[in-house]
């Protein structure tokens, strides 16, 4: 195999003593500059050939029920959502009245790592277009993101940004898409029919100023339709953050005949792998222990995202226990319990998480893990990263105003009343 020197475009002489190594250059290496942007969908947002292992940050489908752990919803007026068991999806429905609305948003935001392409895909079927009906699907929140919108009879790709201090939506009409208008006369020859099920994709090279490609997957092929460019064009950043959520909206902006949108699947993928970074913090009970009541799940440590920081990314990583009596203890990990009593504190002002080690009760929620340990014995730390990855990321409801996030709680039940336990919990904050 000949060896090629890229710097001067020559081949090296054959030398049997040299090892010959195949190298695949990045998708943009030595390529001609294309003013309209990177149109090669076999390359990621940064032009790297898509041969690297994708790392799934989020995936959602509806095989047996509504996935309430992954999704939060807000219903206004006569709006409703219903699990469709035959089709394995969610039917989002609004009535005829102005103001009826369904909003479905993932309960987590997803970590963007600078220098790595972030690929987002959502599948759906829109309701037939009509006057006063607005439908949105994409990767966005109240403040920032990119999404597809059908408003009245018109179709747009929209960039939402709060970098100016106010929320500004920049809609690009289908007739103005800069790559393929999907009107049958574009490079793909495809005509977009939003009454049929679609796969919407977008990939981000954020870094604050990168490009965002948007498009559809048709017949197994990624078709780019519009690229939002920013580098060498803007001052500052184009959105506040690329760590956002998947979101679906169905809204009556006036009186309509009623409508149903179908929410199917979503995924968020870090292309080129993912390495969890960020500062770890921890909280623990006093060395004298937390006094437990028998026949009760005692909340020894709880976490939640702070008010104003609920789009942060924080993941519990490690738990340790020590029982002060030589008896058995049972512990549970509970998401979204209602915590009463105690004081919420934070380790330092830069932290996005607050903790409570003096709460009185934990009611409801979902038990995601439970086990036992013996007091007055060495208990190996429980490495949550190994068992759950990022699945325990702290969640929140749909953000409409500053509010605290949902809870993550460790409860302990003793063998005997007034037994004592010491627990510690370490978490990692991936946004700062």
Please report, for each region that a protein language model flagged, where it lies by residue.
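Extracellular/lumenal carbohydrate-interaction signature centered on repeated Trp-anchored short motifs
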Residues: 109-120, 189-196, 401
């Amino acid at each position: 195999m000949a060896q090629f020197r890229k710097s001067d475009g020559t081949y090296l002489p054959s030398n049997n003593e040299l090892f010959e190594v195949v190298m695949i250059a990045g998708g943009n290496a030595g390529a001609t500059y294309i003013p309209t942007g990177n149109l090669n969908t076999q390359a990621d947002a940064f032009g790297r050939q898509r041969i690297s292992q994708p790392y799934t940050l989020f995936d959602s489908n509806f095989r047996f029920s509504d996935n309430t752990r992954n999704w939060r919803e807000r219903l206004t007026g006569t709006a409703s959502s219903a699990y469709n068991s035959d089709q394995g999806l969610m039917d989002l429905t609004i009535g005829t009245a102005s103001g009826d609305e369904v909003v479905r948003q993932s309960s987590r935001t997803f970590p963007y790592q600078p220098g790595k392409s972030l690929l987002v895909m959502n599948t759906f079927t829109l309701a037939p277009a009509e006057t006063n009906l607005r439908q949105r699907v994409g990767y966005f929140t109240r403040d920032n993101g990119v999404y597809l919108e059908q408003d009245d009879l018109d179709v747009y790709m929209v960039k939402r940004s709060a970098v100016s201090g106010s929320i500004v939506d920049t809609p690009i009409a289908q007739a103005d898409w800069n790559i393929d208008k999907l009107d049958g006369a574009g490079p793909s020859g495809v005509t977009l029919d939003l009454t049929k099920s679609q796969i919407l994709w977008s990939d981000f090279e954020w870094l604050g100023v990168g490009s965002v490609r948007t498009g559809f997957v048709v017949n197994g092929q990624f078709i780019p339709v519009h690229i939002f460019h920013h580098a060498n064009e803007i001052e500052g950043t184009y959105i506040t953050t690329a760590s956002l959520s998947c979101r679906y909206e169905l809204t009556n902006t006036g009186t309509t005949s009623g409508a149903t949108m179908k929410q199917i699947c979503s995924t968020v993928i870090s292309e080129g792998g993912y390495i969890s970074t960020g500062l770890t913090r921890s909280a623990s009970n006093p060395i004298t222990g937390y006094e437990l009541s028998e026949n009760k799940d005692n909340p020894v440590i709880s976490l939640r995202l702070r008010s104003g920081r609920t789009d942060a990314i924080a993941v519990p990583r490690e738990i340790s226990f020590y029982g002060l009596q030589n008896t058995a203890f049972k512990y549970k990990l509970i998401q979204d319990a209602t915590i009463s009593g105690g004081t919420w504190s934070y380790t330092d002002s830069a932290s996005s998480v607050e903790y409570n080690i003096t709460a009185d009760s934990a009611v409801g929620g979902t038990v995601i893990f439970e086990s036992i340990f013996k007091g007055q014995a060495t208990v190996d730390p429980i490495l949550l990263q190994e068992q759950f990855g990022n699945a325990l990321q702290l969640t929140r409801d749909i953000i409409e105003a500053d509010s605290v996030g949902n809870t993550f709680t460790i409860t302990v039940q003793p063998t005997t009343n007034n037994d004592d336990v010491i627990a510690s919990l370490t978490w990692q904050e991936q946004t700062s």
